[in-house]
């Protein structure tokens, strides 16, 4: 009676676990019902049942062999894919090598027109540049070079020989090199040999406002420049 009471006082222990993961039983050699049935089918009727330790070791060995077989089966499946990769690379590599010179020729063909266009632009600019540049006017003829005689005294008018003051000498000096009085200082009054109209055109061209090439391409709001 004392032994029975001590056994009842003990906590219930967990059943043994089968190698497959399910709960086993001591009656079925610590195996689940399915594993125990498979084990009985494999064992012949005449042979005696082995011990529990041997059965467990056999099950573990079978599981390890099955795992090894699975790994051996899966490994060959990867090898063909790995072997196919170099073949694909070998197939694609000639295409890239063949396309290499094609791309070089394409680059050359694309670059050559740009060089020609730059040359054409430079020629057009050189042709247009003389039009924009002002014409050079020859130096005015000196009194010595022209058929007219040299003025002896700058204190008197070259046309009427009237005496001139200092202010009249400064105001009456002409670009042809002679000094005239107030009555003959205009070019029409003393038959001036200097090309005043050509000089005026030249000065107008020099003072002309040159338009910037960027005009019309940039956007600017009205009133931004004033702020």
Swiss-Prot record:
Expressed in testis. Zn(2+) 1 binds at residues 18, 20, 32, 35. Pfam families: zf-A20, zf-AN1. InterPro entries: AN1-like_Znf, AN1_A20_ZnFinger, Znf_A20, Znf_AN1. A zinc finger (AN1-type) spans 151-200. GO terms for molecular function: DNA binding; zinc ion binding. It comes from the Eukaryota. Residues 78-96, 113-127 have a biased composition (Polar residues). Residues 49-59, 66-77 have a biased composition (Low complexity). This is AN1-type zinc finger protein 3. It comes from Mus musculus (Mouse). The gene is Zfand3.
